[in-house]
Amino acid sequence: MKDLVKFLKAQSKTSEDFDVIKIGLASPDMIRSWSFGEVKKPETINYRTFKPERDGLFCARIFGPVKDYECLCGKYKRLKHRGVICEKCGVEVTQTKVRRERMGHIELASPVAHIWFLKSLPSRIGLLLDMPLRDIERVLYFEMYIVTEPGMTDLERGQLLTEEQYLDAEDRWQDEFEAKMGAEAIQDLLKGMDLEAECEKLREELQETNSETKRKKITKRLKLLEAFVQSGNKPEWMVMTVLPVLPPDLRPLVPLDGGRFATSDLNDLYRRVINRNNRLKRLLDLIAPDIIVRNEKRMLQESVDALLDNGRRGRAITGSNRRPLKSLADMIKGKQGRFRQNLLGKRVDYSGRSVITVGPYLHLHQCGLPKKMALELFRPFIYAKLESRGYATTIKAAKKMVEREDAIVWDILAEVIREHPILLNRAPTLHRLGIQAFEPILIEGKAIQLHPLVCAAFNADFDGDQMAVHVPLTLEAQLEARALMMSTNNVLSPANGDPIIVPSQDVVLGLYYMTREKVNGKGEGMLLQDPREAEKAYRTGEAELHSRVKVRITEYVKNEAGEFDAKTTLTDTTIGRAILWMIAPKGMPYSLFNQTLGKKAISKLINEAYRRLGLKEAVMFADQIMYTGFAYAARSGSSVGIDDMEIPAKKYEIISAAEEEVAEIQEQFQSGLVTAGERYNKVIDIWAAANERVAKAMMENLSQEEVINREGNPEKQASFNSIFMMADSGARGSAAQIRQLAGMRGLMARPDGSIIETPITANFREGLNVLQYFISTHGARKGLADTALKTANSGYLTRRLVDVAQDLVIVEDDCGTHEGLVMTPLIEGGDEKVPLRELVLGRVAAEDILKPGTEEVLIPRNTLLDEKLCDVLDANSVDSVKVRSVVTCDTDFGVCAKCYGRDLARGHLINQGEAVGVIAAQSIGEPGTQLTMRTFHIGGAASAAAKESSVQVKNTGTVHLMNAKFVTNDESKLVLTSRNTELTITDAFGRTKEHYKVPYGAVLSKGDGQEVTAGETIANWDPHTMPVVSEVSGFVKFVDIIDGLTVTRQTDELTGLSSIVVQDVGERATAGKDLRPTIKLVDANGNDIFLPETDVLAQYFLPGKAIVSLDDGAAVKVGEPLARIPQESVGTKDITGGLPRVADLFEARKPKEPAILAEISGIVSFGKETKGKRRLLITPAEGETYEEMIPKWRQLNVFEGEMVQRGDVISDGAETPHDILRLRGVRAVTEYIVNEVQDVYRLQGVKINDKHIEVIVRQMLRKAVITKAYDSEFLEGEQVEVARVKIVNRQREAEGKPPVEFERELLGITKASLATESFISAASFQETTRVLTEAAVAGKRDELRGLKENVIVGRLIPAGTGFAYHQNRHKHRLVDDVVAKLSEEDEAAIADEFVMTADDASANLAEMLNMADDAE
């Protein structure tokens, strides 16, 4: 028995115990060593006997027996002959499963180039030989000769010769040289390469060359050569002489009835290769004419190509039904390939699916499971119980009992199911809450019952949705399901940390109705001794639910010792609120209940319960809330009738007023006062405003009603109109929807997004006429089409995000960095968009937080900022905090818990082993379907409103100007002469309240540090033109301003004033091309004036289109405009919004017209212009001048002689994240991407924590480009993982060498996924062929660090509960190394202590769970 166990262990050991997977090129000897024999014939199986043919593709002698322990001829049967080889048929007697693992081979009569290394770009063979792919193909497909041995001739090695040239050369030199064609020639060339020498040569070339392109080319080739040297691959192995044959059971041939066969396409492809190979062998034996042999060799090459990757070269080989045959490459790539179909997504046994329906009486941790399903799913457990109880003697008997459905079976089912959690899953599973565990309750009927509160997490509704059930079988799985996946453990959303178990719809309506107030309700003013009495009064009809009464309320407050102190007060409240208080858990304040509860308030209730009282209380409270809500929703009798939609009386007059305005615009248009575009924009504006007014009138009408109070006076109260209540409570519907019911439908959009200018003035209550209905359908159909596209796009975005972030796991507690991001509240204009509290909650402080204006430490560094500490920050009005971030985390291959902060779904510091990458990807991807696909067209009307021209302050406070330069004009106002000036208003505590961007040339009435009062306008500017501001006072002197050459004079017809307009260089006559129109300022004597405190002349170069309204010699004062440059009013600008915008940001795509940023700090000047471009020069204080060519049509934001800082915007446009990273660093680019992504999500009202976006940004930044390599293993210009460089630099520092210099690089998520260290992960994502080719040539090793690789090789993932398992495996490896050195006896003793199995892993899990509980 012991031996048998040992034997079984030995069999299973081989596949389990590895830590690295290496991929490489197979040498011919290696292929032969795998093989169990050569396949010589193309036959498959005998069609009469169905036995495999000998030496054929299914040969039993090569691949193993067809039946278990039985040879082909039947001489040896049974287990006792195990391992015998039959002398008659040559088959080894063993299990038939060896037919899945034994390979064969084909000896090719002529070498064949492997198509992957030839055609997968860049071509590896081409790169190695330094030849173009076209030439190599000509040689391979027998069109040209190539010289392999030049000998003493003047031919060169690798030179191509045509047929004629070859014959000439043969005549001249006879046998001096050697030239061949076909794969043999390429093989000879590859064999003859001396890789080391070639590397040396390239290194020297790299030192000498200066041209960038050459360097790139050499580096590429050098990298490939070095990879070959290091990996031990030989270049000639890229040309195959032996072809491996896949085991037959992996390319099955199945006989169908009727004598036909269903076969895998691979068999056809192999047959083709064998046929051609055998024919070629025969031709070579016969010494056939060259041309025939060549043709056969070419056909062999083509058939091998088709087998490996059909359709990569030439037309794909098709089968009988004219569809291309599925080659080996097709087997592994794509959604149906091996990776995605079989390794990453498997079907699961013990599962079922059914329709879901509501289970309003369930507890949160329960679900209703139909008896029929349960019986089927829990079969093995029932069999075991029946046998152990003695009801059945054998499994067969038990099976019969279950099939007969005996009465006893149901009792046992109930017993088995007790406390055995099951998993429910609703597709699509967009985030981890899409699979949760519940305890099953057996029910009659055939639908699964689901608890209403988890619907939000599953995104489920009961209109026919289906859900799948899975049964966790092992004890470990049940434990995990209960401890980690139970619905009661998933109260908070991992995306933002808010409760996800929030009542909606009926429950909200019930609670809202219950907590409303009513003026002069029955029983108003009663005094009641406690909520029980209030309920009694309500039940007996003494008082209405909404009546205002006084009730004695007893609250419980936690004291220092953690016990509850009772506190009773007489409170003004309503009957309903008092009744609701009866379900409140101890420790909640009554103030939260004493209000009209809408959806937001209820969410806050549950959140408070969770934070104050912990998980268990919060869950029980949520359940009670739900039961109460349902009960009172039923009592309320809310329903919708057509009379509830009250149309405001004002509607008709608003509409007729709008129609008059439109008619007026139309007249103006016809008399030519406004353009067609302006007319269209104005009309749309008028209707939009009218619609708003109707909506407002309607809401005023609906939301209030007048009643008579107890004193007999009229009083307004919130209306009890059903439609209003539903919208107001947040149960269903919104003001916009009510507007369509009772106001007017308003403007509709065409499918292309533009707006139809005739609005629908009717609403749904009045009904639409045919035209109005038709207009409605127009835009509505587009909405439906969009939704379908959106779902696919959103899913693809999620897939890319998961792929890029999948290997990011919390691996240590603290990396010890002092770096971090500085968080400040997000303020746009005069209002705070996101308060500081939201940004830092759940983060860890990177530095001590000081009390503003003192040195007193409020919060020490490395403290997790929770709700209480955030209150401290608010109380002390701290307005910027430096917090740790994953982007600045120093951990290699992972992140640390401190840099991540709070686990949002649990509320404490995150545990080690948590897969934060996947959580981040799910949190960003899941709301993707809610984002729009729209591209927003902003027309003239909307953009006119967007162009501000002044700053009006909303708060009283102090003005602060950032990077501002200005001059003071004679009215002692400031005129800005700097570009990106920011103006902020701070309050008495120094907190920033408002934030504005102010353009060049703006006139400020208050300076830096001055006080302002609310409502004051402190800055003005002209939005349509940019002035050129004089910085000194003096007299104007025109230089190169020559009428007709460089400028033209224009006279305004209305005012009669004339002005000078500078011409664009392109429009000028030849004589004026090199002139530079300039305004110079001189003093009264005509001497040059210099700018204050500099030696720069006060002269202003005028760009094209500039308008000068001064005359030569005019006097100007400081701060006066010398000229104006019209800002082209940009027409309709498309703003990419929604999902495409998020995808663009994460893909780090460059926008069409990116902003141009200054590469260095210095003084701007302009050099010689070329045909379409201007030359911009920036001269720094010391060092090289930087120059850049800029297209003329780009509007520049700088004048000649102006000082710019590195990273300043020179020409407006969308900023490129790559530029931001290069010029302003990692923090700036993180901030940019986080803010831009958040803008899109905020617009849709989706809340996502910044952390998740930062996680993705970290993954986008994981590569670096080496700028100075010194004597390290890296090449300059090579792309390497940042972690690798850091590790090397640490070693170099220890050795006292200079560190390798590098620049961080930003990769889009697709690129980053493909550039990951793990080739398995990259291959299973996209471009499988390219990834595998690259990896094989380089002999890459996959350390199996990420989650995906481990799933693919079938291991526990190194995250969550598998984290401990992997750490232990690591420990054992170290122990094994020690053990190997010890003697045999000691080994046995130690091995007993260190055996880690999956069972141990589960023990570890239990340990971890206990730790987690303690932490909570």
From Swiss-Prot:
The keyword Transferase applies. One of its GO terms (cellular component) is DNA-directed RNA polymerase complex. Zn(2+) 1 binds at C71, C73, C86, C89. Signal peptide: none annotated. It comes from the Bacteria. Its EC number is 2.7.7.6. Zn(2+) 2 binds at C815, C889, C896, C899. It catalyses: RNA(n) + a ribonucleoside 5'-triphosphate = RNA(n+1) + diphosphate. It is an enzyme of class 2 (transferase). Pfam families: RNA_pol_Rpb1_1, RNA_pol_Rpb1_2, RNA_pol_Rpb1_3, RNA_pol_Rpb1_4, RNA_pol_Rpb1_5. Mg(2+) binds at D461, D463, D465. Keywords: DNA-directed RNA polymerase, Magnesium, Metal-binding, Nucleotidyltransferase, Transcription, Transferase, Zinc. One of its GO terms (molecular function) is zinc ion binding. Its cofactor is Mg(2+); Zn(2+). Disulfide bonds: none annotated. One of its GO terms (biological process) is DNA-templated transcription. Binds 1 Mg(2+) ion per subunit. Binds 2 Zn(2+) ions per subunit. InterPro entries: DNA-dir_RpoC_beta_prime, DNA-dir_RpoC_beta_prime_bact, RNA_pol_asu, RNA_pol_N, RNA_pol_Rpb1_1, RNA_pol_Rpb1_3, RNA_pol_Rpb1_3_sf, RNA_pol_Rpb1_4. The RNAP catalytic core consists of 2 alpha, 1 beta, 1 beta' and 1 omega subunit. When a sigma factor is associated with the core the holoenzyme is formed, which can initiate transcription. Belongs to the RNA polymerase beta' chain family. NCBIfam families: rpoC_TIGR. DNA-dependent RNA polymerase catalyzes the transcription of DNA into RNA using the four ribonucleoside triphosphates as substrates. This is DNA-directed RNA polymerase subunit beta'. It comes from Haemophilus influenzae (strain PittGG). The gene is rpoC.
